[in-house]
Amino acid sequence: MDTPAVRRWFHRTGKRRVLVFVHGFDTRHDEAVFRFAQLVHDTGTDFVPVLFSWASRGSVWAYDYDKESATVARDALERVLRTAVADPGVADVTVLAHSMGGWPAVEAVRQMAIRDGGVSAKLGNVILASPDLDVDVFRGQLARIGRGPRFTLFVSRDDHALALAKFVTGGGVRLGAIDPFAAPHRAMLERQGVDVIDLTAMSGGDSLNHDKFTKSPDVVRLLGERFLAGQPVSDAHVGLGDRVGAVLIGTVGSVTTLAVGAR
């Protein structure tokens, strides 16, 4: 990693907030660039955008290859995050990871906690959209991280890509497909202070229901106006009329209907 170049990029726009996006499985570099550029445009966020691109083969038949590549990438991602939080010109850092990208993202934060005895307060939010991550592994990662960034999950029980990942991995429950109300997940989420947005009742916009967080205008607006602005949904009343069964389980175990319109 060219650390001086990364630092120059942080300072290029004069903005003090950094958004690091980690793409998911079966995503070539050009596809990741397009997706992130579209997301930055649609959310209208006031961030320095940083795409962390790892070596996906870009094939649905290369799951094991991509998982190994994502694992290798966690050290480089840790260096990017460490560079960001150490820069005096950076005020806060948000990580947004999709699908398999959630694995190196949480691992990088875990490694920071191990090396430093904690995570910098500048790393304020980690948002995992449709995370392809074993739920028990995630529980262990959070235990090791301890007091750290706010974690937010976008989940959907009808995510067919994660259903296939569960089969490929031998039946391990994928974090992005949990029922946040069901035991033992709810207790874990409450105990760890994890916020969860359940998008199951929404149409997916794609045949696999794996990209709901970018396909729904309401969810994109929610990302831009609240999460990426550092304002958790639990801090504000939201209302758009028609509702679906989206929920928030926050640090005090509250459950709130979110303003995400049906499609």
Predicted segment positions?
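Gly/Ala-rich beta-loop-alpha elbow adjacent to hydrolase catalytic centers
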Residues: 77, 96-105
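The conserved beta1-alpha1 loop
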Residues: 20-24, 98-99, 130
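Alpha/beta-hydrolase fold active-site loops
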Residues: 17
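Lipolytic serine-hydrolase domain surface
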Residues: 4, 10-13, 33-49, 53-92, ...
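Serine-hydrolase catalytic-loop signature spanning alpha/beta hydrolases and amidase-signature enzymes
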Residues: 26-28
